[in-house]
A protein has these predicted regions:
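Charged, gly/pro-rich active-site loop segments
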Residues: 2, 78-171, 209-291
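Short coil-to-beta transition motif at edge beta-strands of beta-rich domains
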Residues: 13, 64-67, 176-177, 215-226
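Short beta-strand segments
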Residues: 14-53, 69-73, 79, 83, ...
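Residues that flank catalytic or metal-binding motifs in active/ligand-binding sites
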Residues: 15, 31, 65, 85-87, ...
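Short beta-strand segments in beta-sandwich/barrel cores
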Residues: 17, 67, 91-93
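Short, solvent-exposed aromatic-acidic interface loops
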Residues: 50-55, 257-261
Length: 291
């Protein structure tokens, strides 16, 4: 699987991408990741890193390795232009933690994007779960879709409604952040992700619209809005899973779950928070026997 020079510049230059993975119920969760330019054009692979401390994401990918990465924002990266790139593929099995690989390969690869890592007696201990237990996830690329100029949306059949119904279950989070993505499971079983406009409606739903199109019918879907500064400092994230009803480029989204996060705008405070979250997640993963 190859791709153009224009696409390669985006895969190699974007600071963040939207990782979409499939839930056990057949929905999609979208979360920003830092791909730090990881890709092998000759081998047809892309990648990103994550920590064993964030085990739920890894568990979902292990259960269903069909994933997608939406390269949708040029902010604070090295690529230019407004081309939207959606890469769909199959994630390889999660490898064991390899601190030498992280230090010697991933560290230098990440430095232009994230800045040099904090080092020293305190930081080495505090960020152990975040850095030393970090792994590179490699994705064997199946499809590279671009927009404008290409189709991002297939024609998957409607899904059966959940037992608890399709109406909104939580109050919509504000979608007034610069970057918004909506995703669902496409006809081939891979997540499909499009950029959207999103506004809360009086009935508790979120009105969504995408010039790239939406799949006709009803289905589970994931929605995310996010913003970030250089080196992902000050990352703000608002996520929903829920139910999408669409016809043409417009639809109504009923939020069923919500999650939000706002990182400190100071890098030192951000790393302190990252270390705490990763250590807590790793402790839970070990207690559950998944690490």
């Amino acid at each position: 699987m190859g791709w153009s020079d224009e696409v390669d510049a985006i895969l190699g230059g974007d600071l963040t991408a939207g990782l979409a993975y499939v839930t056990p119920a057949g929905g999609v969760v979208i979360t920003p990741v830092a791909p730090i330019g990881l890709r092998d054009r000759a081998a047809g692979t892309v990648g990103f890193t994550t920590s064993f401390g964030f085990s739920k994401k890894l568990d979902r990918i292990k259960r269903n390795p069909k994933v997608a990465l939406a390269y949708h924002a040029r902010d604070h990266g090295f690529a230019d232009g407004d081309l939207y790139v959606l890469v769909q593929g199959v994630a390889r099995p999660v490898p064991q933690a390899d601190p030498d690989h992280i230090r010697d390969v991933i560290g230098p690869q990440a430095a232009p994007f994230m800045g040099p890592p904090k080092q020293g007696f305190f930081w080495d201990r505090w960020l152990q779960a975040y850095y030393a237990d970090r792994v590179e996830i490699t994705v064997d690329v199946e499809h590279v879709l671009t927009w404008p100029g290409g189709d991002l949306v297939s024609a998957p059949p409607s899904q059966s409604p959940p037992k608890k119904g399709t109406r909104p279950r939580v109050k919509p989070l504000g979608m007034d952040l610069p970057h918004r993505l909506l995703g669902w499971v496409g006809e081939a079983g891979f997540p499909e992700v499009v950029p959207v406009d999103a506004d809360a409606a009086a009935d508790g739903t979120i009105k969504v619209a995408s010039e790239a199109g939406l799949p006709a019918g009803e289905r589970r879907a994931g929605l995310v809005a996010h913003d970030y500064n250089a080196q992902l400092i000050g990352l703000e994230l608002r996520q929903h899973t829920g139910w999408l009803t669409a016809d043409g480029p417009r639809g109504a989204y009923a939020p069923h779950t919500e999650s939000k996060f706002k990182a400190p705008a100071n890098k030192t405070l951000l790393l302190l928070a990252n270390g705490f979250i990763a250590r807590r997640g790793l402790k839970k993963a070990r207690a559950a026997g998944t690490r």
